[in-house]
Structure formats: structure tokens, C-alpha cells
Amino acid sequence: MCIPCFTTNPNMAAKCNACCGSRRGSCRGPQCIC
């Protein structure tokens, strides 16, 4: 879990990746998962 995310926002994937650092982040449900 990293930051809250919204699947309707096309920029969330990039924000999840940035929040997770080198690990690939993904937006699942209400949270970014690392």
C-alpha cells in the first residue's frame, strides 16, 4: 500500500509507480499496491 488511488484517473498509474520507487506500483481498488 502506498497512496490512495482512483482507477478513473489516467495519471494514477504513474503516481503509484513514483510512490513505490523502483518497484512497480499498481492501482487496485482504493489503494496503490507496491
Swiss-Prot record:
Subcellular location: Secreted
Protein keywords: Chloride channel impairing toxin, Disulfide bond, Ion channel impairing toxin, Knottin, Secreted, Toxin, Voltage-gated chloride channel impairing toxin
GO molecular function per UniProt: chloride channel regulator activity; toxin activity
Function: Toxin with unknown function in healthy organisms. On glioma cells, interacts with chloride channels (probably ClC-3/CLCN3) and MMP2 at the surface of glioma cells. This complex is then internalized via caveolae, thus inhibiting the chloride channels necessary for cell shrinkage and tumor propagation. Inhibits migration and invasion of U87 glioma cells expressing CLCN3/ClC-3 voltage-gated chloride channels.
Family assignment from sequence similarity: Belongs to the short scorpion toxin superfamily. Chloride channel inhibitor family.
Other comments on record: Negative results: intracerebroventricular injection into mice does not induce neurotoxicity (up to 1 ug doses).
Protein name: Chlorotoxin-like peptide AaCtx
